[in-house]
Amino acid sequence: MRYPGGLSKAVTFSYDDGVVQDMRLVEILDKHGLKGTFNLNTSSFGPGKVNWSSRRMTAEQIVALFKNSPHEVAVHTLNHPFLEQLPPNMATYEVLGDRKNIEDIFGTVCRGMAYPFGFSFSA
């Protein structure tokens, strides 16, 4: 498999939840000409939305950081639930609702997704 420029290897950087530390990560990635994927929960922007809301960026900060940046913004569900514990219709709502919000906010097609809490099967 080849990547752009004929390269045979690639590295990815992926960060979840839209936390304030992402602002510093974007600075570092930009400084070195690297791109990252930032997986956002669009119902959890800003203070008062989740238990650790002081770590979350506001909607305004998210837009300012990513609206015209080279970084990918991807689905991470609306509310960060354990998807495997939800009925199929609720899991679908979480994923598609987050995708719609991201596409509305950034005016682009959203293709990526990261499962909240990771994903694994018990043996």
PLM feature segments, named:
Residues 18-19, 43:
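Short, glycine/serine-rich, charged loops/turns that create anion-binding
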Residues 15-17, 115:
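Short acidic donor-binding/metal-coordinating loop in glycosyltransferase active sites
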Residues 30-123:
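Metal-dependent polysaccharide deacetylase catalytic core of the NodB/CE4 family, i.e.
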Residues 19-20, 79:
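Short, glycine/acidic-enriched loop or turn micro-motifs at the edges of active sites
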Residues 1-13, 20, 54-56, 62-63:
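N-terminal pre-catalytic segment of deacetylase/amide-hydrolase enzymes
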Residues 22-23, 82:
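Generic hydrophobic alpha-helical membrane-span motif
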Residues 24-28:
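A short acidic, amphipathic alpha-helical/loop segment
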